[in-house]
Amino acid sequence: VKKNILLFFLLVLTLASITFAAPLKGTIQVVGSTSVQPLAEELAQAFMAKNPGVKIFVQGGGSGAGITSAINGTADIGNSSRELKPEEATAGIHETVIAKDGIAVIAHPANSVKNLTVEEIQKIYLGEITNWKEVGGPNLSIALVNREAGSGTRGAFEELVMGKNAGKMSNKTLVQASTGAVQQTVAITKEAIGYISLGSLDPKAVKALLVNGVEASDQNITNKTYKLWRPFLMLTKTAPRGVTKAFIDWILSMEGQKIVARDYITVK
């Protein structure tokens, strides 16, 4: 009997020590980069399926809007597809790298040009090279497609390709407000050149050019032979807490990174 009583008390103590996690509940507002947006939406859907008490609302607006929203606390998470500038980093916001993504330089599929050097791309966007025949292509005036000021993809492109000439880009460009709009424009414009998120590339619609003879691919970004890539950041006003922390922690888990790996480069 004493043995049974002892076992009973041990069982009670064991059960008492188990903490049952309450179901997650809450709302998360996510704002920012249109390059990060498709991935953020996919991650949000998977997380909400696991946690029916959580509602996540994802919208674009560009990296500038995401960074500002995080600094001001007007969104729970701000998405950025470029590194923070020094003045942004000093605002005290907390950043989490959730993925890495390449920048693909794209042309119309019918364009015979297959490769451009970084210097040639820079000269094209400076307006110094204006015809495709100057880089071995057809006799067509080059139509420049650019992203809007505040775009993280544009910010990364300016840093990685334009360098100190970032402020001198030609103003004879067709400015588009999202990765999808750039891709769509290049797909229907034979003389166009543009740049987009590699993870959003549709090879049936546009052609990704080699850069310095290297293909834009996850493998070449990982082995550091393709140089045009940037991090995908999730930004919060302070260290993430509550349901926001649970969401970001899950993104960094094996389960979350499996979703990242479908189209992007994992951080683990």
List each language-model region with its residue ranges:
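Positively charged n-region of N-terminal signal peptides that target proteins for export
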Residues: 1-7
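Exported/periplasmic ABC-transporter solute-binding proteins
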Residues: 20-268
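Bacterial N-terminal signal peptides
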Residues: 7-17
